[in-house]
Amino acid sequence: MTSYRPFVVLEAATVLSGTAAGITMVAFPWLVLQTTGDATAAATIAAVTAVPLLLSMLVTGSAVDMLGRRRVAVASDLFSMCAVALVPILALTLGLDYGLLLVVAALSSVFDPAGLTARQSMLPEAAAKAGLDLERANGIHESAYGFAFLL
Protein backbone atom coordinates (compact mmCIF):
# COMPACT_ATOMS: atom_id res chain seq x y z
CA MET A 1 0.00 0.00 0.00
CA THR A 2 1.32 3.41 -1.00
CA SER A 3 1.65 6.03 1.71
CA TYR A 4 3.08 9.45 0.94
CA ARG A 5 3.06 10.52 4.58
CA PRO A 6 6.61 9.35 5.53
CA PHE A 7 8.06 10.99 2.41
CA VAL A 8 6.17 14.25 2.93
CA VAL A 9 7.15 14.40 6.61
CA LEU A 10 10.79 13.72 5.71
CA GLU A 11 10.81 16.47 3.10
CA ALA A 12 9.07 18.92 5.45
CA ALA A 13 11.75 18.21 8.06
CA THR A 14 14.42 18.72 5.41
CA VAL A 15 12.98 22.09 4.39
CA LEU A 16 12.61 23.28 7.99
CA SER A 17 16.07 22.15 9.03
CA GLY A 18 17.70 23.49 5.87
CA THR A 19 15.97 26.83 6.26
CA ALA A 20 17.16 27.11 9.84
CA ALA A 21 20.72 26.19 8.86
CA GLY A 22 20.72 28.69 6.01
CA ILE A 23 19.39 31.48 8.19
CA THR A 24 21.97 30.74 10.86
CA MET A 25 24.81 30.82 8.35
CA VAL A 26 23.76 34.36 7.38
CA ALA A 27 22.51 35.60 10.75
CA PHE A 28 25.61 35.06 12.86
CA PRO A 29 28.02 37.03 10.64
CA TRP A 30 25.36 39.69 10.10
CA LEU A 31 24.74 39.99 13.84
CA VAL A 32 28.45 40.36 14.51
CA LEU A 33 28.80 42.95 11.75
CA GLN A 34 25.85 44.93 13.12
CA THR A 35 27.01 44.81 16.73
CA THR A 36 30.75 45.32 16.21
CA GLY A 37 30.99 47.00 12.81
CA ASP A 38 34.06 44.83 12.20
CA ALA A 39 34.09 42.91 8.90
CA THR A 40 36.99 40.76 10.08
CA ALA A 41 35.00 39.65 13.11
CA ALA A 42 32.06 38.80 10.85
CA ALA A 43 34.32 36.74 8.59
CA THR A 44 35.83 35.01 11.60
CA ILE A 45 32.44 33.96 12.90
CA ALA A 46 31.52 32.67 9.42
CA ALA A 47 34.66 30.53 9.49
CA VAL A 48 33.93 29.40 13.04
CA THR A 49 30.55 28.09 11.89
CA ALA A 50 32.15 26.25 8.96
CA VAL A 51 35.00 24.46 10.75
CA PRO A 52 32.89 22.50 13.29
CA LEU A 53 30.54 21.64 10.45
CA LEU A 54 33.40 20.07 8.51
CA LEU A 55 34.84 18.27 11.53
CA SER A 56 31.51 16.84 12.65
CA MET A 57 30.98 15.36 9.18
CA LEU A 58 33.73 12.87 10.00
CA VAL A 59 31.66 11.13 12.68
CA THR A 60 28.07 11.62 11.56
CA GLY A 61 27.77 8.36 9.63
CA SER A 62 28.88 6.35 12.63
CA ALA A 63 26.53 8.26 14.91
CA VAL A 64 23.59 7.57 12.61
CA ASP A 65 24.46 3.86 12.47
CA MET A 66 24.93 3.51 16.23
CA LEU A 67 22.08 5.68 17.50
CA GLY A 68 19.47 5.32 14.77
CA ARG A 69 18.39 7.54 11.91
CA ARG A 70 15.25 9.06 13.38
CA ARG A 71 16.80 9.62 16.79
CA VAL A 72 19.83 11.40 15.31
CA ALA A 73 17.70 13.52 12.96
CA VAL A 74 15.46 14.75 15.76
CA ALA A 75 18.25 15.17 18.32
CA SER A 76 20.51 17.10 15.95
CA ASP A 77 17.75 19.57 15.11
CA LEU A 78 16.84 19.97 18.78
CA PHE A 79 20.47 20.58 19.76
CA SER A 80 20.88 23.10 16.93
CA MET A 81 17.69 24.85 18.00
CA CYS A 82 18.89 25.04 21.62
CA ALA A 83 22.23 26.47 20.53
CA VAL A 84 20.53 29.17 18.46
CA ALA A 85 18.09 29.88 21.31
CA LEU A 86 21.11 30.77 23.43
CA VAL A 87 21.57 33.98 21.41
CA PRO A 88 18.53 35.85 22.77
CA ILE A 89 19.00 34.30 26.20
CA LEU A 90 22.58 35.57 26.34
CA ALA A 91 21.52 38.93 24.93
CA LEU A 92 18.98 39.35 27.72
CA THR A 93 21.16 38.06 30.54
CA LEU A 94 24.88 38.56 29.89
CA GLY A 95 24.86 40.72 26.78
CA LEU A 96 26.07 39.78 23.31
CA ASP A 97 29.76 39.21 23.85
CA TYR A 98 31.78 38.36 20.72
CA GLY A 99 33.50 35.41 22.42
CA LEU A 100 30.19 33.91 23.49
CA LEU A 101 28.82 34.37 19.99
CA LEU A 102 31.79 32.45 18.61
CA VAL A 103 31.01 29.53 20.92
CA VAL A 104 27.28 29.60 20.17
CA ALA A 105 27.93 29.82 16.42
CA ALA A 106 30.21 26.79 16.60
CA LEU A 107 27.64 24.85 18.64
CA SER A 108 24.83 25.72 16.26
CA SER A 109 26.64 24.27 13.25
CA VAL A 110 28.21 21.18 14.79
CA PHE A 111 24.94 19.21 14.84
CA ASP A 112 23.66 20.00 11.32
CA PRO A 113 25.59 17.33 9.36
CA ALA A 114 24.27 14.54 11.59
CA GLY A 115 20.68 15.55 10.91
CA LEU A 116 21.32 15.89 7.20
CA THR A 117 22.96 12.47 7.02
CA ALA A 118 20.19 10.87 9.06
CA ARG A 119 17.46 12.33 6.85
CA GLN A 120 19.29 11.23 3.69
CA SER A 121 19.55 7.69 5.05
CA MET A 122 15.77 7.63 5.63
CA LEU A 123 15.08 8.57 2.01
CA PRO A 124 15.10 5.10 0.37
CA GLU A 125 12.57 3.69 2.83
CA ALA A 126 10.29 6.74 2.61
CA ALA A 127 10.49 6.68 -1.19
CA ALA A 128 9.60 2.99 -1.31
CA LYS A 129 6.55 3.57 0.91
CA ALA A 130 5.46 6.42 -1.37
CA GLY A 131 5.95 4.28 -4.47
CA LEU A 132 8.62 6.61 -5.88
CA ASP A 133 11.74 5.41 -7.61
CA LEU A 134 14.90 6.42 -5.79
CA GLU A 135 16.14 8.76 -8.52
CA ARG A 136 12.95 10.83 -8.43
CA ALA A 137 12.83 10.83 -4.62
CA ASN A 138 16.47 11.90 -4.43
CA GLY A 139 15.82 14.72 -6.89
CA ILE A 140 12.88 15.93 -4.83
CA HIS A 141 14.93 15.65 -1.63
CA GLU A 142 17.88 17.62 -2.99
CA SER A 143 15.54 20.23 -4.49
CA ALA A 144 13.81 20.62 -1.13
CA TYR A 145 17.14 21.11 0.62
CA GLY A 146 18.30 23.59 -2.02
CA PHE A 147 14.98 25.45 -1.80
CA ALA A 148 15.39 25.68 1.95
CA PHE A 149 18.60 27.67 1.56
CA LEU A 150 16.83 30.12 -0.76
CA LEU A 151 14.32 30.97 1.93
What are these regions (language model features)?
Residues 1-151:
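Alpha-helical transmembrane-bundle signature of multi-pass membrane transport and export proteins
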